[in-house]
Amino acid sequence: MLAAACSGAGPELRPGGNGPPNTSIAGIPAVSAADPALLGGMVLCVTGPGSAVITAIKPIHPTGAIEVVDYATRPNPGQTGGEQLGVESGTLRAYGFSANRTVNAQCGDGDSGQGDELGIAVSVPPGTNAGTTGWEIDYRIGDHAASTSFPLGAILCSTPSLHDKPCKHVWQQFGLHL
């Protein structure tokens, strides 16, 4: 009885699929407060009964200042033949996200794709460039607070081109070259 009580804290929020998601970094030019970058394709699921309410999202190992302007979840459109958000600009609402910040989908077996898609809107201060290796996602399931991460990196440049020298400098800070 004691072993069962100490064996875990209940369901958790985690990236969907079988094993950790592939690490990638997206480059996005012309990012500003007036035209935030949108990042999607991040499928999350709950490992047991319950719903996870996302309470905050922060960049992991950022270079420069990144502001998370908005975030929301929706049922994974890939499950019904639709397209995930990917990398865009504009608002999450324009791409079918509501103000929902709850993950209700239970994790499936293997690489089922079961889960809810997380979309994030981010910006950088005027005239600056920034980058991150991924996102720390804080959440609550009932009274249990925890965090998980998703390794979708982003290079966010206020310059009009990813090939502009200040933007290339951010890539180099992550050991990458265009």
Positions of the model-derived regions?
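Non-catalytic macromolecular-recognition regions in eukaryotic signaling proteins
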Residues: C6-L178
